[in-house]
A protein has these predicted regions:
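Substrate-recognition element of Asp-dependent hydrolases with the DxDx(T/V) motif
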Residues: 84-87, 92-96, 103-134, 142-148, ...
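Short acidic capping loops at alpha-helix termini that bridge into adjacent secondary structure
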Residues: 81, 138-142, 170-175
Length: 177
């Protein structure tokens, strides 16, 4: 019988793609005065590639945050501060939350019966902001953010650190969604 459920945050509970798109669109509009869909799509590809490099240990989290904008701005010949863009984008992303369809109802239903936890990669300030603005803390017992844990998913060390912080965890009675 299942007792513990670990939910991934991005695109499981909250629609990260939508929040990312809106934060990027607002950042580009503010700093550049325009935000064409082509540029937004290209950012997504560049950003995913940078996070893959982080997971492979080839970049640091700080490098990812800046490099994704540096590459985008070089490609589109934009002369805007990469650091300023990264700061504004993260601030906007930190308040952007849109529930995935049915996620809120699932949490409300499961919370009284199971130990619910959030497991997520990402920047602590952004993820904490999104979790807080979405009101997710009311349903979960703890939140495990890779930047705070010191390892990124899917590294087994990340999950070992999470499991060690869950009182009385029985792995055979635990699922990850």
């Amino acid at each position: 019988m299942i007792e513990t459920v670990l939910f991934d945050l991005d695109n499981t509970l909250l629609d990260f793609d939508r929040a990312e798109h809106e934060a990027l669109r607002q950042t580009l509009l503010h700093l550049c005065g325009y935000a064409p869909e082509e540029m937004l799509r290209r950012y997504n590809a560049i950003n995913r590639a940078q996070w893959k490099l982080l997971e492979q240990g080839k970049l640091t989290r700080h490098e990812v945050k800046l490099r994704r904008f540096a590459l985008l701005f070089d490609e589109f010949d934009i002369r805007v501060s990469v650091k300023k863009a990264a700061r504004q984008y993260e601030a906007l992303l930190g308040i952007g939350h849109y529930y995935m369809e049915g996620a809120e109802e699932v949490l409300k239903t499961l919370a009284p019966c199971y130990g619910l936890y959030i497991v997520t990669n990402g920047t602590a300030s952004v993820q904490q902001g999104r979790i807080g603005s979405a009101g997710l803390r009311q349903w979960v017992r703890d939140i495990f953010i890779s930047e705070e844990i010191g390892f990124d998913k899917p590294n087994p060390a990340y999950f070992e650190a999470c499991f060690a912080r869950i009182p009385g965890l029985q792995r055979q009675k635990t699922v990850i969604v």
